[in-house]
Design a protein with these regions (language model features):
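C-terminal non-catalytic regions of proteins with extracellular/luminal or membrane-system context
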Residues: 3-21, 33-34, 56, 64-226
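Short glycine/proline- and acidic residue-enriched helix-loop micro-motifs
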Residues: 51-60
C-alpha cells in the first residue's frame, strides 16, 4: 500500500520543471537494484508458495512464541486479593469473550477465526470441569450499534428473548460461583485502521452485565480485550 500523492502529481511536476526527472530515475533505479538482488526478475513470485506456507503458518513453534508474547504482555491494572485464581474454588467465566473466536483483530484477512483459542477452550484444559461454568451473558455490542469493517458490517442482532436468556444464564452462574472471571471489551471492528473512537469505553451492554454480576457476586476479575 502507498499514498497516491506521487502517482497523481509527479508527471505534472516534472513537466512544470518543479521536479528533476533524474531524481525520479535515481529513485526507480534503487528499487530495481533491490529487486535484482532479491532475484525477483528471475522469480517474481519468490517465496509465494502455498506448500511452504503450510510449513510455518500456525506451526507449533510460532504458536508457542505467540502464546509467550501474549503471556508476557498482560497488564495488571488492579488486584484486591482475588488473583491468582484459586483452582480449588468454583469459578464462573461470564462475558462475551468467554468463548468468542473473533479475536484476530484488524488486518488479519487471511486468518481463520477457528484457529483462535478462546478463554473457555484454554480454561477447560486447566480447571476442573466440576468447578467451572461458562456463560456468554451478552453480545459484544448491543442491537443499537452498527459497525462497518472492510468486508463486513452489522454484527448479529439478538431478540429480546435471546438477550434475556443469555443474561439469566450468566447471573445464575455468577451466583453459584465463588468468583467470576469476566472476559469483556471492545468489538474487533472498533479497533484498527479508520476506527478512531471518541470514547474508548467498554460497550454499555457489557457494562450493564458487569454491574448486575457485581451485584450478585463481588469477587470479579475483569479480563479486557482491547
Amino acid at each position: 500500500m502507498m499514498t497516491s500523492v506521487y502517482a497523481a502529481n509527479l508527471c505534472r511536476l516534472v513537466e512544470e520543471g518543479e521536479v528533476d526527472e533524474h531524481l525520479i530515475d535515481e529513485c526507480c533505479l534503487r528499487i530495481l537494484e533491490l529487486k535484482n538482488k532479491l532475484g525477483l526478475f528471475e522469480n517474481p513470485y519468490k517465496d509465494a508458495d502455498a506448500e511452504k506456507e503450510k510449513a510455518y503458518n500456525l506451526c507449533p513453534e510460532h504458536r508457542a512464541l505467540a502464546k509467550k508474547a501474549a503471556e508476557e504482555s498482560f497488564v495488571l491494572l488492579k488486584n484486591d486479593g482475588v488473583l491468582p485464581l484459586d483452582t480449588a474454588k468454583k469459578i464462573a467465566f461470564v462475558g462475551p469473550y468467554t468463548n468468542n473466536h473473533e479475536i484476530k483483530s484488524s488486518w488479519s484477512f487471511t486468518g481463520d477465526s477457528k484457529d483462535c483459542v478462546t478463554i473457555q477452550e484454554a480454561a477447560e484444559k486447566v480447571f476442573d470441569a466440576s468447578r467451572t461454568t461458562y456463560a456468554e451473558g451478552c453480545p459484544v455490542i448491543g442491537n443499537d450499534v452498527e459497525l462497518i469493517g472492510f468486508t463486513e458490517t452489522t454484527p448479529k442482532k439478538y431478540s429480546e428473548e435471546e438477550l434475556a436468556a443469555m443474561e439469566q444464564s450468566a447471573l445464575q452462574a455468577a451466583k453459584e460461583a465463588d468468583l467470576v472471571v469476566m472476559p469483556m471489551g471492545e468489538h474487533y471492528l472498533q479497533s484498527g485502521e479508520a476506527t478512531s473512537r471518541a470514547m474508548i469505553d467498554v460497550p454499555e451492554i457489557q457494562m450493564e452485565l458487569f454491574r448486575k454480576v457485581l451485584a450478585v457476586n463481588p469477587n470479579v476479575v475483569v479480563v479486557l480485550f482491547n
